[in-house]
């Protein structure tokens, strides 16, 4: 279904009895719209861990306004389907109040400059991130971590800084070759590196069960993205007691408002 011409390969609208779509929160995307409006299966099963959309659009109309089965994050943790986590909001003195606020979020180029260029104090912030990580992790030998960054420059800067301070790290971006991404994952799991810093990767579709430390190194206005990134560390793994989350909270723009009703609340 990644092909725009998939309907030409299977033109019969009733050909499929059962269609399963993962990450169904993407249903508003044009490619999904084409699929959903074209085929008429007897059963349509949509699955997502993040049904809430920041644009307010609901996925429920595809299912007659009803959710067949639902389990929320706290319930999944209580039932030991997911790993418990400890979440620390770490004070970040980086002043974001003067960064332009456009289209419901911070200007990413300005954020990138603040987080990766020395004239804006990027090295001081990276030093603070490393100090706080050292304060909260129990044993560096056991760390399997991901750091979510705002830009390619930011991811590289953080990886370089950690490496320069004896914390083996790598960074991955959309420019990274598939073979290198696979190798990075193997190195993280084996303990050869302690952190992988990423931008626009690992939000979904990646399963690294041993991840036990997550660093939120940028503001995230999207609840969906926040939960997806948090979810990278919630998989159960042998010997993993809990996930440690460090959220570096800067002096933010006062336009931020984290409110999002659940799909049931929207009914």
Regions found by a protein language model. Give the residues of each.
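Conserved helix/coil segment N-terminal to the catalytic DExD/H
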Residues: 1-15, 33
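A short beta-strand element within the Helicase C-terminal
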Residues: 206-219, 244-247
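Conserved SF2 helicase motif VI
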Residues: 222-237
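Conserved small/polar residues in nucleotide/adenosyl-binding loops
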Residues: 258-265
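Conserved interdomain linker/interface between the two RecA-like ATPase lobes of SF2 helicase motors
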Residues: 72-138
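Conserved helicase ATPase core of P-loop NTP-dependent helicases/translocases
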Residues: 170, 176-198
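Post-DEXD/H (motif II) to motif III coupling segment of the RecA-like Helicase ATP-binding lobe
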Residues: 29-82
């Amino acid at each position: 279904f990644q092909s725009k011409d998939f309907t030409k390969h299977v033109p019969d609208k009733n050909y499929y009895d059962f269609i399963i779509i993962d990450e169904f929160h993407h249903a508003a995307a044009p490619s999904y719209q084409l699929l959903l409006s074209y085929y008429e299966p007897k059963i349509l099963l949509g699955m997502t861990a993040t049904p809430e959309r920041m644009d307010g659009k609901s996925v429920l109309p595809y299912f007659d306004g009803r959710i067949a089965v639902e389990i929320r994050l706290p319930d999944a943790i209580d039932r030991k389907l997911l790993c418990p986590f400890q979440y620390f909001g770490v004070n970040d003195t980086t002043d974001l109040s003067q960064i332009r606020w456009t289209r419901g979020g911070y200007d990413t180029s300005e954020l990138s400059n603040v987080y990766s260029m020395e004239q804006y104090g990027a090295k001081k912030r990276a030093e603070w991130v490393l100090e706080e990580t050292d304060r909260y992790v129990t044993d560096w030998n056991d760390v399997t971590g991901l750091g979510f960054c705002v830009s390619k420059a930011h991811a590289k800067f953080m990886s370089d800084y950690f490496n320069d301070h004896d914390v083996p790290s790598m960074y991955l971006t959309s420019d990274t070759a598939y073979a290198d991404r696979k190798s990075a994952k193997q190195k993280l799991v084996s303990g050869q590196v302690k952190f992988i810093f990423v931008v626009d990767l690992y939000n979904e579709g990646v399963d690294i069960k041993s991840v036990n430390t997550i660093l939120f190194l940028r503001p995230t206005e999207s609840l969906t993205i926040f939960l997806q990134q948090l979810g990278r560390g919630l998989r159960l793994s042998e010997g993993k007691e809990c996930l440690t989350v460090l959220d570096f909270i800067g002096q933010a723009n006062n336009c931020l408002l984290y409110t999002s009703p659940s799909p049931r609340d929207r009914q």
